[in-house]
Amino acid sequence: MFSIIFSNPVKPFNSVIIHQIRFFSRDPFPNKVQHYLYRANLIDSIRLSLRSPTTSDRTLASLLNHRLLDSFVVKNALRSSPSVSSAWSIFKTLSHKSPRFSFETETLHAFATVLAKFQRSSELNSLIGVVNAWKFRNVHFSFMNLLNLYATAGDFDSVLKTWDEYRCSGEEKKGCTESYNIVMQVYMTLGKDSEAVQTFDQIINEGGIPNSRTFTIMIEHLVKLGNLDAAMKIFETLPLMRITRTLKHYSVLVEAFVDAQRFDEVKTLIAEMKSDGKFPSRRMLEPLKRMREAGFEHETEEFLREMLPDERIKDISMYSMDNPSDSEDEGDEYKDDVNEAQVKLKPWLDPKALATSLKKWSSDAVTALEEANFVWTNLLVCKMLRNFRAPETAWSFFCWVAIQPGFTHDAYTIERMMAMLARNGQVELVDKLISKVRIEGIKLPFSTIRLIIDLYGISKKPEAAIKVFNEDRTLCGSISDFNLMLLYSSLLRTLTKCKRNAEALETLEDMMLTGVSPDIQTFSGLMYHFALQGEIQTVERLFSMVRQIGLEPDPYMLKLLVQAYCRCERSVLAYRVFQDMKDSNLMPDRETKELLVKSLWREEKRKEAAAVEESYEEENDNKNSSNVLRLALKGHVWTISSTDISRVYNLYRDCVLKTST
């Protein structure tokens, strides 16, 4: 059900396209869909040519010399190369026999990626050297390109060397999160466990924002060291930090726990995966099969049924762009004449490019789409919806595909559509889908309801968010206290984004009355918002509520308060918070300290400014910065608390160092 492919070989379409070329002197394609399909045919011809033992170099040269060949076709043909020699064949043929073709950034990057994938470091370095010598005009490899290429190629020395150059270049202040992730993974692969931990520590110290992939690497590292329980604890902490749990997280853990025959944990992960609205990746197929063989048929039946290949999908076999067959029957006849070992492939398909070709939804484009005979699976439709830019086009496609033979929308496709509509403020259409879901008895994942509420904050639709929270959250079934707290937090954040301060405070009161306590991040977000609005009494009331419900003010909360008070020109209040931090043996980071000092000077509080400077100097003189708040974490007002990140870091460090010693 979830395979991506054409229902019929695309051979008949070739003759249609070639026929069309005669009538269109400027643009041989009446619409972008037919252009996409022609490109797909050409890519498939090249793919088959590279894999067939009977195909001559002349055939490949003929395909690569086609007058409609472009960088898009070359890029994807290179990416589909089955070997380095195949990629070199494309590269050399284009260089020597196709003078009209000019290598661009995307084609050279694709070629470099193939060399890296097959770990041909010397050839990769040669290509990088040629590119850096400006032999290909304006083509350039950035530091991030190089880090990714070297890491893929397994050239870890070059990764670390490039990382040092990157940090010294000034291209980024300290380096983006993904650069830290690459280095962290390299150290993990090399078995340099303490260096991997130090790299994670660097992300925090240098103001980076750990993302989902950061925690993927951490979980993989712990699994590699045999610390499955610690890996599971990290995974369970992610929702607290509002970090999205990805399919990669689930795949790594499911595989590890199946290997350890700890099937209770696997059942928990499967249930969580459904709640998060995730569908298993291919990597999970074998572990789930093994789990079924161990007697857990009921738990795995749904996923395995949908992961099996779709019988409607047919392979493509050898055909030529220059001599296409006119029918399926002729194609079958051709198959009988070739060797039994003939190459067969699933047709090439790029959901992003196909969605882009439908940018202008028209009757001609729809006709071309129908004639292509795609098998519309739920996974393909999800990928298409993700890549539409305009909600109107996405909605037209969503409605059109609903009436295609053999296709039925499910919770996954509905979530994709709802997310786009909510982000763009299309409240009526979201309500229409919700009504349909309710009538048909479809159960939505909890993550869908929460996502809609979050996205209504972006589109500034607070009433719609309140309506979803109050009336539609039952569509995901029973909600745990923890998930209800997350849902309340999302609603509060949306209301503050929309400047609906009164409703936010009413919602907070309702939350407390129902016995659901906000976490420290929610309080931090509210206090920061009201401090920026200049509502100091509300901030103080919220601060007292933190202690009333038994929470300890988070160091990051105190830091946020200092920043907020400074920005609304209440530096005296910021100084009081600074004193509270000092009394608790904490100091803000340098950036926050400098903001406080500037604010105090601006408001002519010179004595207080000098006291802050003196306190900071004393701390440095003690040569013990362990009590200096290290968390910059810009942009994480509502998400990561210093307590959570410290707990994760300590767990990771202790497990890794204990195992290493």
Swiss-Prot record:
Starting at the broadest rank, the lineage of the source organism is:
Eukaryota, Viridiplantae, Streptophyta, Embryophyta, Tracheophyta
Q: Where are the PPR repeats?
A: 139-173, 176-210, 211-245, 246-280, 410-444, 445-475, 484-518, 519-553, 554-588
Q: Which domain of life is it from?
A: Eukaryota
Checking InterPro entries in the record gives: At5g66631-like (IPR044175), Pentatricopeptide_rpt (IPR002885), TPR-like_helical_dom_sf (IPR011990)
Query: To which protein family does this belong?
Result: Belongs to the PPR family. P subfamily.
Q: What is the designated name of this protein? A: Pentatricopeptide repeat-containing protein At5g66631
Q: Which organism is it from?
A: Arabidopsis thaliana
Write the record's keywords in alphabetical order, separated by commas.
Repeat
Is Chloroplast found in the keyword set? no
- Note the PROSITE patterns from the entry: PPR
